[in-house]
Regions:
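N-terminal secretory signal peptides and thylakoid transit peptides that target proteins
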Residues: 1-17
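Boundary/entry segment of secreted carbohydrate-active catalytic domains
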Residues: 32-76
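Aromatic-lined carbohydrate-recognition surfaces of secreted/lumenal glycan-active proteins
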Residues: 128-138, 196-221, 269-276
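Substrate-binding cleft of secreted/luminal carbohydrate-active enzymes
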Residues: 270-347
């Protein structure tokens, strides 16, 4: 689908993309025509880790009841999403479940993990459960810190015992993200494999995912393929880094094409995309996250679709809300992205 056809298509759906213009660079970088993959999942959280970014939904989520968490899961299922990735089971040295590791978060819902997994059982959502943050989430040293590692592994065991009976407990996510520059660090591979070793013992049927950043810097050469072979993960969901302004939608197709070839050579982990459906209200990392216009999100989907098995988004929460929802979490503009995406998805 060329740029002109895409614009005509979106205008026909009434999504207000008059701002889209023909871009010769975009035309040159566009992947081969083909089906645009939908967004089949999203990251999920009880509190956003960067407080300034989550100012529009963190206060609402603190007050969510069990019923509201169920409503939110139902909403997500209604837009065709199948997977949710729970970013954190602990944050800022407080836990979202009952544990001796940390004191619990003071939330209106006594057991939010149970609430969302029970709802996910009902609505057919598959959850990846986050094995973090059991140290300082902003520190690069957390993955090598023996104290944090001990807490992290204790949490994996406790989470299995408490919630492993849920049909929606589909997999694990290791949230201390890697910076690919231009390869994974040995420390990150050791961290991943240590977590995965225990997870395989406790929950052998689950899938394991990571979502590294530095996608634009990745060098998918022989050494990179060997690293993919060495890591015990089932899925690598690469961040497209469009929302954080490190990459442009005209560039990302080439990044994912190279990574696809590396994954095909390795034949071990699946390649998924983690597209950022937000934009910053002001300075990157130091202002509120706002929903991106669907015209841009569509371009992100189009760019990665030929090269990945699935597309996940960062993230539904805060960036998308069903109009009139009793579980509203985010700014008013989030209903526009929800409606525009749902209109597109329903037309497929």
């Amino acid at each position: 689908m060329n740029d002109l056809n895409r614009r005509d298509f979106l205008v026909a759906l009434g999504m207000g993309v008059s701002a889209l213009t023909l871009d010769p660079v975009a035309a040159q970088a566009s992947p081969a025509p083909g089906r645009i993959k939908p967004i089949t999942g999203s990251w999920f959280e009880f509190q956003h880790h960067a407080t300034v970014e989550g100012v529009d939904w963190n206060p609402s989520c603190v007050r969510f009841s069990t019923r509201q968490w169920e409503t939110k899961i139902k909403e997500i299922a209604e837009v065709g999403m199948e997977y949710l990735v729970l970013m954190a089971t602990a944050l800022y040295y407080r836990a979202f479940y009952k544990t001796s590791i940390f004191a619990r978060w003071d939330l209106a819902c006594a057991d939010p993990i149970e609430a969302v997994l029970s709802a996910a059982d009902r609505y057919g959502i598959k959850f990846f459960i986050g094995g973090g943050f059991y140290g300082d989430w902003e520190s690069d040293n957390t993955i090598t810190d023996p104290v944090a590692a001990k807490k992290r592994l204790q949490a994996v065991e406790e989470l299995t015992n408490l919630y492993g009976h849920h049909a929606s407990f589909f997999g694990w996510y290791w949230p201390d993200e890697a910076f690919i520059n231009p390869h994974f660090s040995p420390e990150f591979i050791e961290y991943v494999n240590g977590c995965s070793r225990l997870a395989r013992q406790l929950t052998p049927k689950t899938q394991i995912m990571i979502a590294p950043y530095g996608t634009r810097k990745a060098l998918p050469d022989d050494a990179y393929v060997r690293q993919l072979d060495a890591m015990d993960v089932d899925i690598v969901a690469y961040q497209d880094e469009v929302g954080v302004r490190k990459s442009k939608v005209t560039e990302t197709a080439a990044f994912y094409e190279g990574l696809r070839k590396a994954h095909d050579r390795s034949q071990k982990a699946k390649i998924w995309a983690d597209i950022e459906i937000f934009e910053f209200q002001g300075q990157v990392y130091n202002s509120a996250l706002m929903p991106a216009p669907f015209s841009r999100v569509f371009q992100q989907m189009e760019a990665v679709s030929p090269w990945v098995d699935r597309i996940l988004a960062y993230q539904y929460q805060g960036m998308m809300n069903k109009p009139g929802s009793e579980a509203f979490a985010g700014c008013p503009a989030s209903t526009r992205l929800y409606t525009d995406y749902l209109n597109w998805h329903s037309a497929q």
